[in-house]
């Protein structure tokens, strides 16, 4: 099973474990770095939890996810159309004030991460903000039906040097 198959087949299980998690402390730190009504790309929006929160705070949000089933749920939950798109297909330039990639791009292989981080840098406006999160460590591979690239400080610094 690949990662998208996992999310498409275990949608309800994933949603029930994430949609009600209070992430406002981290979300608010991110939002504090943006202008009011800034345009945010929720890059791998999952259940739509963060998209909904950002919209409720008055921000403009474009939300994408690779999973067809998560896009369906998130669209209804957040009240906006969530576009089904793969991270590798991001091709916009200077389009967003902020990019929120919460526990999403960690599903890419290390080599893909370099390319996608570069695309994110091109898609965010000058002085824009990018948030991303990884599981801590150096593991790369399949875990519980999904692919993960974990990062510690050294691995993340190495990745960021390449973009």
Residue spans for each PLM region:
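Helix-to-beta-strand junctions that scaffold the AdoMet/dcAdoMet cofactor pocket
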Residues: 109, 124-125
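Class I (Rossmann-like) S-adenosyl-L-methionine-dependent methyltransferase catalytic domain
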Residues: 1-94, 111-115, 119, 129-163
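A conserved beta-strand element that flanks and buttresses the S-adenosyl-L-methionine
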Residues: 100-101
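Conserved acidic residues
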Residues: 97
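Hydrophobic adenine-recognition pocket in adenosine-nucleotide-binding enzymes
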Residues: 104
